[in-house]
């Protein structure tokens, strides 16, 4: 009979430790406070306005980059997140730029530029120095803009 209480205690401790390990695993794969999880990344929106390079530097200090967008689902999520946090479809810096070579767009996080959400007619060459990408231009579309313009910005980092 003495072995039954020991087994019960052992079973209880094993379950408790197992649950604790599971909680720890989940906590390490969640986003920090102020960041929102989507897919395999965390996103945070900054209302304060900065030029593109300063916004990228701010994202790097937080362990990420200006957000890259790889499909329509991510674009919809980002548009909704910005609207939810700002109360409007605010024009916002994302990580695209063609500063190295005109017309050759790159993401600042080094990921493949495999999705394009440009507004029809964008990116344009109306102003030659428009090397940085913003989202929420005339809806949920992208636009190339002057990098020195101050905008809100969206950071992203991998889990």
UniProtKB/Swiss-Prot annotation:
Not glycosylated. Residues 1-21 form the signal peptide. SMART domains: CLECT. One of its GO terms (molecular function) is carbohydrate binding. Induction: Hemagglutination is completely inhibited by galactose. Is not inhibited by mannose, and the chelating agent EDTA. Ca(2+) binds at residues 122, 124, 130, 143. InterPro entries: C-type_lectin-like (IPR001304), C-type_lectin-like/link_sf (IPR016186), C-type_lectin/snaclec_domain (IPR050111), CTDL_fold (IPR016187). Keywords: Calcium, Cleavage on pair of basic residues, Disulfide bond, Hemagglutinin, Inflammatory response, Lectin, Metal-binding, Secreted, Signal, Toxin. Gene3D superfamilies: Mannose-Binding Protein A, subunit A. GO terms for cellular component: extracellular region. Disulfide bonds join 31-42, 59-155, 132-147. One of its GO terms (biological process) is inflammatory response. A motif (Galactose-binding) lies at residues 122-124. Monomer. Galactose specific lectin that exhibits hemagglutination activity (minimum hemagluttination concentration = 2.5 ug/well) in a calcium-independent fashion. Has remarkable pro-inflammatory activity, inducing neutrophil mobilization in mice. Plays a crucial role in the innate immune system and chronic manifestations, especially in neutrophil mobilization. Belongs to the true venom lectin family. This is Galactose-specific lectin nattectin. It comes from Thalassophryne nattereri (Copper Joe toadfish).
